[in-house]
Amino acid sequence: ASGGNRFDLGMLCYMPQIWASDCTDALQRARIQNGYSYGYPQSVLGAHVSASPNHQTLRRIPLESRFAIACAGVLGYECNLSDLSAGELAEIREEVKLYKEWREVLQFGQFYRLKGHAAKGRFDTEAVRWNIVSPDGTRAVGITLQNQVLPNYSHRYLKTRGLLEDRIYHVYNRSLKYDIRRMGDLINTVSPIPVKQDSLLHGALSHLVQLDGEKEDHIVTGSILNKAGIPLASGYQG
């Protein structure tokens, strides 16, 4: 196919998987996969982590974000592994390990599209949210993709669908470390000596110091998650 109409119910009788789109940009793919979810399960959706900058949009998206969208389908990687750093290869190994652990839920669980609300009930349109629940309702994966960072933004909430109301769930997120180079010359707000952005010194420091990501760790009932939700830790807001 050179464009749309790739998915055909008749063809799915003969082949178990269809390539969703030649556009592998994670922001675009989130919308594409969101649309496919109205008619097709994740188990037939080919979804890949590709190079950054993306070949279709030239957008730079972090590896962990590209994985977060691609894992909501049949995960694959279309990267030249010989071009990746040791850190990126280690991250991919962890991603594949995580995907294998949760593959049954991600591919065969019930897929829910979630509406987002910020504080005081304000509707949040700057994020794509999904949660995928195992057939027995005991396990689930939540995915949130922030489209853009806004300054002074209020906390986001995790409000689910499909969880067992009377079950106790342990809610936690992936433990991630972030490259300090993503903060640009903000490093000079804490560095005792001037550090030029993208310099050799900047690169050397990135191998020694990494930023901790947000931490989520909650014990809560399915009823609370489905009906009220829980506030998430604040990310970078400027």
Question: For the regions a protein language model found, what residue spans apply to each?
Answer:
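Glycan-recognition surfaces
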Residues: 1-83
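Active-site proximal loops enriched in glycine and acidic residues that flank catalytic Cys/His/Asp
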Residues: 1-3, 79-83, 143-146, 162, ...
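Short, solvent-exposed polar/charged micro-motifs at secondary-structure junctions
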Residues: 5-10, 120-126, 181-182
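Catalytic cores of secreted or luminal carbohydrate-active enzymes
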Residues: 64-117
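Conserved, mostly hydrophobic/aromatic
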Residues: 70, 142, 171
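Alpha-helical protein-protein interaction modules
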Residues: 106, 110, 116-125, 154-156, ...
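Carbohydrate-binding surface patches
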Residues: 119-165
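C-terminal beta-sandwich/jelly-roll accessory domains of carbohydrate-active enzymes
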Residues: 148-238
